[in-house]
Design a protein with these regions (language model features):
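Alpha-helical transmembrane segments of integral membrane proteins
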Residues: 1-168
């Protein structure tokens, strides 16, 4: 966990900018760097969930009656740790989309022949385009907004569906 703590102590955008500058801006380098730096949150979440579930009374009672560690892990710990991880994956996807768009907007992501919402928004920086040519920046901005909100709503729905404490 100390390695994850070290990675999490630096702002992710700074690390991503440095690594993309070293590797070179392309869709593959951005995807790999965002994926490689995203593991720390999942490692922290999995570690905390496994510790929390392993301290529950039903796990301790299974240990008390002599259930094997393999059976405890597969029957109790993994199924009860799966829901928070699935929810975190959906939120991480939305964050990765925003990060890629931000990097493309800054010129460190997908290069201009390639299509990216960040590149499309970068093309609409002048006041003339912003005020008189709405069709240049409005569709990519709205598409980005709808995509990220949809993924976040999907994560909320999964959380509500998998959380046994919520009463309908």
């Amino acid at each position: 966990m100390r390695v994850a703590d070290i990675f999490m102590s630096f702002p992710s955008i700074v690390l991503i900018l440095v690594l993309v500058a070293v590797i070179g801006p392309s869709i593959w380098s951005v995807t790999i760097v965002i994926g490689v730096l995203g593991w720390t949150q999942f490692a922290r979440l999995i570690y905390a969930n496994v510790l929390s579930v392993s301290e529950k009374e039903y796990v301790e009672s299974a240990r008390a009656i002599g259930t094997s560690n393999y059976k405890i892990i597969t029957r109790y710990i993994l199924p009860n740790s799966f829901a928070p991880i699935l929810i975190a994956i959906t939120f991480q996807m939305a964050s990765a989309i925003l990060m890629e768009s931000s990097l493309s907007f800054l010129g460190m992501g997908v290069q201009p022949p390639g299509a990216s919402w960040g590149n499309m928004l970068y093309d609409a920086q002048s006041i003339t385009v912003l005020s008189k040519r709405l069709w240049i920046w409005m569709p990519p901005g709205i598409a980005l907004l709808i995509t990220v909100l949809s993924i976040n709503f999907l994560g909320d729905g999964i959380r509500d569906a998998l959380d046994p404490k919520i009463k309908i």
